[in-house]
Amino acid sequence: MGKQNYGYRSSLIEAVLQDTYEVVDEILFNSPDTINFKNDEGYNIIQLAILNRSEKVYNLIYHIIKRTKSYRGIQDSSDNTILHLAAKLAPSFALERTAGAALQLQQELLWFEEVKKLVLPFQLTERNKYNETPAMVFTKEHLDLMKEGEIWMKTTAESCSITAALIVTVVFAAAITVPGGNQESGLPLFKEKTAFTIFAVSNAFSLFTSATGLLLFLSILTARFSEKDFLVSLPRRLIFGLLMLFISTTAMMVAFGAILVLVFCDKRPWMLAPICAFACLPISVIVTIKVPLLVDLIQSTYYPIFGKHSYLESCKTNRKNTIFMDY
């Protein structure tokens, strides 16, 4: 191997650590044999990508270079397979890319499940130098993160369940207290008004969605909080619970605005604008507070970090991938 290739070593390793797949792609394109480079601890680039959770570099190696089959049997000085490495807790800088302990644990589980697909069946229970299987390593390394994730999930569910319970109380009371009173026949006085129809539909919609959201949040509080629950089950419940909370809040404010319009705006039409403005205020507050969390949950749960992403289409090695087959 030439001196020029060795000059790429530090750049390649640093690019893997930083998950800068463009640099890795450029180096591999110009010098394919650099794929065999190792750092001072003896880890090659796929091992480093797994240890440091560099998903873009991992995807580049896996889907473009077609190199991964030869990595299945690689072990480090402690007899750790690549699945053992995936079971280790990610470095703090990698964990901090994701907000919230529960989502961090979800990302760790996604990595473990991804590498599990890559290894051979017998490697799932293969033991390292310390007589530990990959599953045992994962559980041991993530005990603290699991506790933090449980606290984070419960705290989030509790705060949201309080809001949902308040909405249920308010809209239920509004449903049995008909604005304007009833006729002798028992029918509402305003039943012919469009605003009353909007109120009735919005209030009922708010009641149903807030009650559904409350049940979802309660199901989180009573969950077992096993490792697998953090992968899909708990995040999915929180996603749908937050969606129900957004919808119920919006519907409640629409119902409240419709009643104000019904009562005041026949003779004071100028009040319509301030009513709409103030009705939007609580909606904007809850959106500002909770939408970033909802977006993070949806991206983490439904948008996989592994696979052939669009950014790989422009990689130079994509047009040169056959040269790596014999390495």
Located regions from the model:
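Membrane-proximal extracellular juxtamembrane segment immediately upstream
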Residues: 46, 167-171, 175, 205, ...
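Acidic, Ser/Thr- and Pro/Gly-rich low-complexity regulatory segments
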Residues: 1-165, 176-188, 217-230, 264-269, ...
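C-terminal substrate/ligand-recognition segments
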Residues: 15-17, 21, 55, 198, ...
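Cys/His-rich Zn2+-coordinating "finger/knuckle" modules used by eukaryotic regulatory proteins
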Residues: 191
